[in-house]
UniProtKB/Swiss-Prot annotation:
CDD domains listed in its UniProt record: GCS_H
Protein name: Glycine cleavage system H protein
Gene: gcvH
One GO location term (cellular component): glycine cleavage complex
Family membership: Belongs to the GcvH family.
Subunit structure as annotated in this protein's UniProt entry: The glycine cleavage system is composed of four proteins: P, T, L and H.
Organism of origin: Aliivibrio salmonicida (strain LFI1238)
Length: 126
């Protein structure tokens, strides 16, 4: 796992891209709990998202799980590869399995996220 990632309590990860956007996906822990991912309901480009509200859905052989926006902003890109290869969420949760890129509407949202080392400690306690 990359050290620059930040997380939410609901297991989404965020990578700052350095251009006012962030890339969002679900953590390795989350994909492990879900099992084999068979479908990802992607948001639409230009959709506005609000921190804490669901913006995507990941379906696995075990369950369907809402994915919550870790920050508020506008979807600027979606990972269309997931339409044909949803298993990327399992195989490469921090690389090829990203879900969307979001243009931040409030940089302050990033301060509410959990640093990677603290996130790892929290899931070890579960």
């Amino acid at each position: 796992m990359e050290k620059d990632l930040k997380f939410t309590a609901s297991h989404e990860w965020v990578r700052e891209n350095g251009d006012g956007t962030v890339t969002v996906g679900i953590s390795n822990h989350a994909q492990g709990l879900l099992g084999d991912v068979v479908f990802v309901d992607l948001p639409d480009v230009d959709d506005e998202v609000t921190a804490g509200e669901n913006f995507s859905l990941v379906e696995s052989v075990k369950a369907a799980s809402d994915i919550y926006a870790p920050i508020s902003g506008v979807i600027v890109e979606i990972n269309e590869e997931l339409e044909d290869s949803p298993e990327l969420v399992n195989e490469e949760p921090y690389e090829g399995g990203w879900i969307a890129r979001i243009k931040l509407s409030d940089d302050g949202d990033l301060e509410n996220l959990i640093p990677g080392d603290q996130y790892l400690e929290s899931i070890e306690e579960e």
